[in-house]
């Protein structure tokens, strides 16, 4: 029997006394959460933001985890000093790790452990603190904020202001729950609209004190406090664009020194709107269909399928990396599609009868009906197609991304959250049309679709890591930024010795939040509202 998710848990992470691996500055730490539910294989769940020049980081990124009462969920928090833009951790300095179970964190509410190196020895005096909260409230607060004339802390320029939000815990301490972006060189900063869950902000208590701090960002990590104010949600939600709520930013040290001190700037709240966000299950139970499409790389770099060295070579027991990846991901996602009819395409091969190179040919060779019956149907189409084509090139992703995007664009015209598209591309990794693919992904980020890329073989996957926006927003060649991160890349060989469900768990981990993120952004509700249905019963 499958484990039932009891609840969702939010984990906040901070570290103290980290090892300093940088010469002339301090480490730039980032925390990675790994999960293990069976065997020896750990898989990455998510990463915090990177904090520059800091040995005592408080990460604002919150890890959201499903808590299964009857499953021992082993967690590993790895801390790394990030000095480059690659997604790989092997080329970053390791600052220490901590292993525990989710049950231990939940029962402690706050767990502090020493960080240890891979050999089990202490990572200097480094420690990690993990705080856990159950998420019961799906209300979120949408903010629009700006400031006027915050104190100028920079000698040769203007301040680089950012805000931090803190809530007060039951033991009286302050816990940071959100950090805005830095607005560079600006004494009248306008921050991008942002949202914070009401539970994270104030435990859902409208009269709970919230502390907001304004800082001037410094590259060396010694951020200067401009000022602070305290308020409550009751006060904040009075704000509107017509009538903003304003707060004086007070720096206590300056106030005590100067009798004429007035303030260190004014923070203006232009919008503070509470809204209820549907969960992934609300959408699925409310009738939203996940439409699954497969794209398979048939380029010459895979080698001749008849050769045992080829990535398309089907072994005597009937498998290869392409088929294993397809089964692993497809078996999970097919449960969310009612008719289980999936379009499957190949790209990069010469196809009969003219032997022209095609970058989006149906694997069943039926252009008017490229649908296959379930994952088994896709596997059969793949096996049948392989001996009929000539592997060629180049490796172009953009045609198949644009193909799915056309269907997603049509679905985007609907007034409810009825359809979401997931494209699985399985490739050996040497991409040719990088600029066109970047543009296609940026365009698709505005549509109800996500892209999963599974890299098979041992090729250079640096281009794939570039497309996965985890290191920062992907940009088109013209500089246009993707409004959502919709690409998830995973190298297949990372999971070769893992339980068969591990690959699917990893590549599908971001899909629920991408689905929710899209529909909530456009304020689309499920076709059938589950809450309404329950009330009628």
UniProtKB/Swiss-Prot annotation:
Matching entries from Pfam families are given as: C2 (PF00168), Copine (PF07002)
> What does the entry list as the binding residues for Ca(2+) 4?
154, 216, 218, 224
Q: Where in the cell is it found?
A: Nucleus; Cytoplasm; Cell membrane; Cell junction
Sorted alphabetically, which PROSITE patterns does this protein's record hold? C2
Q: Does the keyword Disulfide bond apply?
A: no
UniProt: Ca(2+) 1 binding residues = 22, 28, 81, 83
The residues listed in the UniProt record as binding Ca(2+) 3, with positions renumbered to this chain, are 154, 160, 216, 218
Identify the cofactor(s): Ca(2+)
Q: Which GO terms describe its biological process?
A: cellular response to calcium ion; cellular response to growth factor stimulus; ERBB2 signaling pathway; positive regulation of cell migration
What UniProt keywords apply to this chain's record, in alphabetical order? Calcium, Cell junction, Cell membrane, Cytoplasm, Membrane, Metal-binding, Nucleus, Phosphoprotein, Repeat
Q: How is it modified after translation?
A: Phosphorylated on serine and threonine residues.
Q: Which SUPFAM superfamilies would you find in this protein's record?
A: C2 domain (Calcium/lipid-binding domain, CaLB) (SSF49562), vWA-like (SSF53300)
Q: Which GO terms describe its molecular function?
A: calcium-dependent phospholipid binding; calcium-dependent protein binding; metal ion binding; receptor tyrosine kinase binding
In this protein, which residues make up the domain named VWFA? Answer: 291-513
* Binding of Ca(2+) 2, residues: 22, 81, 83, 93
**Assigned GO CC terms:** cell junction; cytoplasm; focal adhesion; nucleus; plasma membrane
Report the residues modified as Phosphoserine. Answer: 14, 197, 243
* Quaternary state and interactors: Monomer. Interacts with ERBB2 (preferentially with the tyrosine phosphorylated form); this interaction occurs at the cell membrane and is increased in a growth factor heregulin-dependent manner. Interacts with SHC1; this interaction may mediate the binding of CPNE3 with ERBB2. Interacts with RACK1.
Its biological purpose is as follows: Calcium-dependent phospholipid-binding protein that plays a role in ERBB2-mediated tumor cell migration in response to growth factor heregulin stimulation.
PANTHER family in UniProt: COPINE, COPINE-3
In the record, the note on similarity to other proteins reads: Belongs to the copine family.
Return the protein name.
Copine-3
């Amino acid at each position: 029997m499958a484990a039932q998710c009891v609840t969702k848990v939010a984990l906040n992470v901070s570290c103290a006394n980290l090892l300093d691996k940088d010469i002339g500055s301090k480490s730039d730490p980032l925390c990675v959460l790994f999960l293990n539910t069976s065997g020896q294989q750990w898989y990455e769940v998510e990463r915090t933001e990177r904090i520059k020049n800091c040995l005592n980081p408080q990460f604002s990124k919150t890890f959201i985890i499903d808590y299964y009462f009857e499953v021992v969920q082993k967690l590993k928090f790895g801390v790394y000093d990030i000095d480059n833009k690659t997604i790989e951790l092997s080329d970053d300095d390791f600052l220490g790790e901590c292993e525990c179970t989710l049950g231990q964190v939940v029962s402690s509410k706050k767990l502090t452990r020493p960080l240890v190196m891979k050999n089990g020895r202490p990572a200097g005096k480094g420690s990690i603190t993990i705080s856990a909260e159950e998420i019961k409230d799906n209300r979120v607060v949408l903010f629009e904020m700006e400031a006027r004339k915050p104190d100028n802390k920079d000698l040769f320029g203007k301040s680089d202001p950012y805000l931090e939000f803190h809530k007060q815990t039951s033991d009286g301490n302050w816990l940071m729950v959100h950090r805005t972006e830095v607005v560079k060189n600006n004494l009248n900063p306008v921050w991008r609209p942002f949202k914070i869950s009401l539970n994270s902000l104030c435990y859902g208590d409208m009269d709970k004190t919230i502390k907001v701090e304004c800082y001037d960002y410094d590259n060396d990590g010694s951020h200067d406090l401009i000022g602070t104010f305290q308020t409550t949600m009751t006060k904040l939600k009075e704000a509107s664009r017509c009538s903003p709520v304003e707060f004086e930013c007070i720096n206590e040290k300056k106030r005590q020194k100067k009798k004429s001190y007035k303030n260190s700037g004014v923070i203006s709240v232009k919008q503070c709107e509470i809204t209820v966000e549907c969960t992934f299950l609300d959408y699925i139970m409310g009738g939203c269909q996940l439409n699954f499409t497969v794209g398979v790389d048939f380029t010459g770099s895979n080698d001749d399928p008849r050769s045992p060295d080829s990535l398309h070579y089907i072994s005597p027991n009937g498998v290869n990396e392409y088929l294993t990846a397809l089964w692993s991901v497809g078996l999970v996602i097919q449960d969310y599609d009612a008719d289980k009819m999936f379009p499957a395409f190949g790209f990069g091969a010469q196809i009969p009868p003219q032997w022209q190179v095609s970058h989006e040919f149906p694997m069943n060779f039926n252009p008017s009906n490229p649908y296959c019956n379930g994952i088994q149907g896709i596997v059969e189409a793949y096996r049948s197609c392989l001996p009929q084509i000539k592997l060629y090139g180049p490796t172009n992703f953009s045609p198949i991304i644009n193909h799915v995007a056309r269907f997603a664009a049509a679905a985007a015209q609907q007034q409810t959250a009825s359809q979401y598209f997931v494209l699985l591309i399985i490739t050996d990794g040497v991409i040719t049309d990088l600029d066109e693919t970047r543009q296609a992904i940026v365009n698709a980020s505005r549509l109800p679709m996500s892209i999963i890329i599974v890299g098979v073989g041992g090729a250079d996957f640096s281009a794939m890591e570039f497309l996965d926006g985890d290191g920062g927003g992907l940009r088109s060649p013209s500089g246009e930024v993707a409004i959502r991160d919709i690409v998830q890349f995973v190298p297949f060989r990372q999971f070769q010795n893992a339980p068969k469900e591990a690959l699917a768990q990893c590549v599908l981990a971001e899909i629920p939040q991408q689905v929710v993120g899209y529909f909530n952004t456009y304020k689309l509700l499920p076709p059938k509202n589950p809450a309404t249905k329950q009330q009628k019963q």
